[in-house]
Swiss-Prot record:
Its main location: membrane. Ubiquitously expressed. Highly expressed in heart and placenta. It comes from Homo sapiens. One of its GO terms (cellular component) is basolateral plasma membrane. Belongs to the PA-phosphatase related phosphoesterase family. It is an enzyme of class 3 (hydrolase). This is Phospholipid phosphatase 3. Residues 244-255 are annotated as: Phosphatase sequence motif III. Its EC number is 3.1.3.-, 3.1.3.4. The integrin-binding motif mediates the binding to integrin alpha-5/beta-1 (ITGA5:ITGB1) and integrin alpha-V/beta-3 (ITGAV:ITGB3) and is required for the function in integrin-mediated cell-cell adhesion. Magnesium-independent phospholipid phosphatase of the plasma membrane that catalyzes the dephosphorylation of a variety of glycerolipid and sphingolipid phosphate esters including phosphatidate/PA, lysophosphatidate/LPA, diacylglycerol pyrophosphate/DGPP, sphingosine 1-phosphate/S1P and ceramide 1-phosphate/C1P. Also acts on N-oleoyl ethanolamine phosphate/N-(9Z-octadecenoyl)-ethanolamine phosphate, a potential physiological compound. N-glycosylated. Contains high-mannose oligosaccharides.
Length: 311
């Protein structure tokens, strides 16, 4: 009986899960890899395009009115900030990227775990994880700026910056829409961008993303409480950043809460639906060859039994 090997039945082009062009033509495979990288960069650019347009153009926020007796917008303007934009970006981005670099290098060097079309495992790991993180940053900032210019909520220090001429305003009308600000126009436009807090959304996104990254990559069991301590510290940093905006008279408490919710939502969506941090690795296995059993008729079975009995 002929010994049939299942491996011979596999079409050569289907081995290694690819076509002959990908398996035997490295030039075409390399061009496809470059095309995919360019597509990823294009998607990253498009995700951050609303943020870039709003920040670099003269788009003005929605012109919202106010009530003369609204105490929530009568706070004085503070000259300094507890956490300015430079510190926020430096801490949020630098800490997250350094943690990702450390985690991926440890994972590849010590655990020998890396699967990617990019040949260098270190470059491949950083490309995937840092790319996903920056993609989420772009989405979060675009969401924030779109909300700011669309809603135009007045900051707590709006009247201090606007300095309207109340002698020309009839407060008995209730909601005042027709008014003119005598303050600096750039500061007035910035004072119309209260909802929602960009500091709260950005800090929550970066820190929660890092918390989830530690949950997926920090596998050392030596210190049971070390990982929860690090995660708690990161979340508290995000909370402090958002709450400082209330004490600085930059945002209302509801602005900060909305920013926290938006940053957390984007972080969870990026981690669970875009990145592969919590995705189980599945391998495609070919089915085992079927075992052919010899089928005998009842007469052949009787003859075979008689043959054994005679022996």
């Amino acid at each position: 009986m002929q010994n049939y090997k299942y491996d011979k039945a596999i079409v050569p082009e289907s081995k290694n899960g690819g076509s002959p062009a990908l398996n035997n033509n490295p030039r075409r495979s390399g061009s496809k890899r470059v095309l995919l990288i360019c597509l990823d960069l294009f998607c990253l650019f498009m995700a951050g395009l609303p943020f870039l347009i709003i920040e670099t153009s003269t788009i003005k926020p929605y012109h919202r009115g106010f009530y003369c007796n609204d105490e929530s917008i009568k706070y004085p303007l503070k000259t300094g900030e507890t956490i300015n934009d430079a510190v926020l970006c430096a801490v949020g981005i630098v800490i997250a990227i350094l943690a990702i670099i450390t985690g991926e290098f440890y994972r590849i060097y010590y655990l020998k775990k890396s699967r990617s079309t990019i040949q260098n495992p270190y470059v491949a790991a950083l490309y995937k994880q840092v790319g996903c993180f920056l993609f989420g940053c772009a989405i979060s900032q675009s969401f924030t700026d779109i909300a700011k210019v669309s809603i135009g909520r007045l900051r707590p220090h709006f009247l201090s910056v606007c300095n309207p001429d109340f002698s020309q305003i009839n407060c008995s009308e209730g909601y005042i829409q027709n008014y003119r600000c005598r303050g600096d126009d750039s500061k007035v436009q910035e004072a119309r961008k209260s909802f929602f807090s960009g500091h709260a959304s950005f800090s929550m996104y970066t820190m929660l993303y890092l918390v989830l990254y530690l949950q997926a990559r920090f596998t050392w069991r030596g210190a049971r409480l070390l990982r929860p301590l690090l995660q708690f510290t990161l979340i508290m940093m995000a909370f402090y950043t958002g709450l400082s905006r209330v004490s600085d008279h930059k945002h209302h408490p509801s602005d900060v809460l909305a920013g926290f919710a938006q940053g957390a939502l984007v972080a969870c969506c990026i981690v669970f639906f875009v990145s592969d941090l919590f995705k189980t690795k599945t391998t495609l296995s070919l089915p085992a060859p079927a075992i052919r059993k010899e089928i005998l008729s009842p007469v052949d079975i009787i003859d075979r039994n008689n043959h054994h009995n005679m022996m």
